[in-house]
Amino acid sequence: MSQLKGRAFYWRTLPRSNDGFPRRARDLAHEFALPERSRCAFLQSRPRRLGCGALLWRQTIAHGPSERMTLDEIRSLTEGDLSAVDGVIRARLKSAVPLVDQVAEHIIAGGGKRLRPLLVLLTARACGYQGNAHVEAAAFIEFIHTATLLHDDVVDGSSLRRGRHTANRVFGNPASVLVGDFVYSRAFQMMAALSSQPVMEIMSEATNVIAEGEVLQLMNAHDPHTTEQRYLEVIYRKTAKLFEAGAEVAAVLSGATPRVRQELAAYGRHIGTAYQLVDDVLDYRSNPQERGKNLGDDLAEGKPTLPLIHALRHGDEQQRVIIREAIQRGGVTQLEPVLTAIEATGGLEYAARLAREHAARAKAALAALPESRCRDGLAALAAFSVEHTT
């Protein structure tokens, strides 16, 4: 990777409007529909340069006129709910079958940001919920996410996640698939225990959509003709749908009105889309040690993500040939010229801009909620979705 040093993807210093929002000349036609002087202003931070030309966003957001909220500060708004979720996760992963316990311990030790449970907890509290069912809901949302990761790593042949060997690398593909099934079914046991038909309807539909997304991604693999629309359909189904479902479940448990429920579902959908768009940018511009994944993993798996799709659409003939062949063959032997083509065509910048637009829409949806610290936390998560670096 030493050859990649010096190829840092620079963002110009962004001039700001009177409202404090960053502007760039090339983006003046893409003004965001943000509420004027919103209480939690959407902040675009200047990146910092790390090794391998990392494209990074600081994990802070504007809170009020002068404060900034870190991710840990966002977590603190749940007042112990996240700790309760961790306890539920550990308890519900217990099994009389030793191998299940071993894989479960490997999963727990792997950690994670717990963004989806955090979204559920904050949404419920922002809606005024006073019970405890949101803790179970946050846990089963995380279980669905965990099950999909276990299966994804098998399908993709991944060996590294969060800087550690994947479960399939340690225990083998059969064990990883079967324990994924266990985690998935345990999630539905927990849903059933809530005795809420609307929750079951939301989650059964969501898991079906997620499964379809996995198949669509499989169909797109090694296909250089994948369009932006097809790509966005995949990330909605694979990633954004679970965020959407988590926010909607929290609204249902809180007894929110249909309008609020709809707005919160939109919030989850947009924040999930933004998060995945940035994740796909980071695949080409990140610090592998910090992120816990190899640079160019998507390219190695032949996944035509948005930076590649944009470069194919706007590159010259030589660049298009290089990218088409790289997608078709997979692997990272062409990573260097692919990076050059992506940077020359603004592919990373384009994907990041689209992510910011979705984050802005997520934040706008929060207008349906009354002002509160937890609503501020949800706005902070919208900013984090485009600022995360791992």
What are these regions (language model features)?
Residues 2, 29-30:
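N-terminal amphipathic/hydrophobic targeting modules at extreme N-termini
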Residues 3, 23, 36-44, 50-390:
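All-alpha prenyltransferase/terpene-synthase fold signal
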